UniProtKB/Swiss-Prot annotation:
Predominant place of localization: nucleus
Region: Disordered, residue numbers: 177-238
SMART domains linked: HOX (SM00389)
Summary of the function given for this chain in its UniProt record: Sequence-specific transcription factor which is part of a developmental regulatory system that provides cells with specific positional identities on the anterior-posterior axis.
Signal peptide positions on this chain: none
Gene Ontology cellular-component terms listed: nucleoplasm; nucleus
Name of this protein: Homeobox protein Hox-C11a
Assigned keywords, A-Z: Developmental protein, DNA-binding, Homeobox, Nucleus, Transcription, Transcription regulation
Keyword Nucleus recorded: yes
Molecular-function GO terms, alphabetical: DNA-binding transcription factor activity, RNA polymerase II-specific; RNA polymerase II cis-regulatory region sequence-specific DNA binding
Organism: Danio rerio
InterPro entries for the chain: DUF3528 (IPR021918), HD (IPR001356), HD_metazoa (IPR020479), Homeobox_CS (IPR017970), Homeodomain-like_sf (IPR009057)
Family assignment from sequence similarity: Belongs to the Abd-B homeobox family.
Amino acid sequence: MFNSVNLGNFCSQTRKDRTSEFGDRTGCASNIYLPSCTYYVPEFSAVSSFLPQGPSRQITYPYSTNLSQVQPVRDVSYGLDPSSKWHHRSNYASCYSGEDLVHRDCLPPSTMTEMLMKNESVYSHHHQHHPNSSHPSTGFYTGVGKNNVLPQGFDRFFETAYCSTDNQSEHCLQKSEMNKLETSSQQPTAVSAAREPEKDPEDEEEHTNSGSCTSAATKDGNASKSSHSSTPRTRKKRCPYSKFQIRELEREFFFNVYINKEKRLQLSRMLNLTDRQVKIWFQNRRMKEKKLSRDRLQYFSGNPLL
């Protein structure tokens, strides 16, 4: 009897508990969000989230607001991360064209909340802004700086690095141009200074050996030298010999430094030259060999007085 009474009480209690739990479940079912339903549940905002989070932001979208059941889902997804940790961007950045993304820094200044609450006006402003407007960039796009990779805190390093490389490149270009000008101005003077002593003994030998030079010719030569001394002298091509003629003359000079008359006439007939041309060429070649031997001895001995 006692057991039956207790069982009856237990059964009655369990039935009451079951009915109360079922009532609670039915009450909660009225607050459950069903995406297949077309009605809007106003009690959804009262449901607490299971994760610790900051105050979630309400976002309005440029499309029609008839699909209002999507908004709480967006609200929950944006509320997962703390509001102070990350700077949220618009989800439609991938849908914008390249020009819209390039001119994203030209938006009028406003706070983050205003930008998020007025997303529709921002989207329309992307298509109607003027490229010449120079408004400061807002907090809505503070995640990325000028280098499109690092935050804006690294912009000063980015600018100094680029300025230093630009200045170095410009400085190097200026130095190279100055060096080119200096070398170009010094080269003809050095060449003329090096060729003048080579030319003078040859000219002297030609004038002394030919016997055709007079005092008037020397005066004219001195006058021409004085007139051209101010300008960089470039040695004119005075050699009328061909490569074949020079090769044969050099071969004969290698065997005989001083050529006799018979060999000289033979070379003149073979090379289609005059006797005088062959004789003058050998004289000049001997002076050149003498100068080369002197320079060679000075180079190997190291004595500049020779």
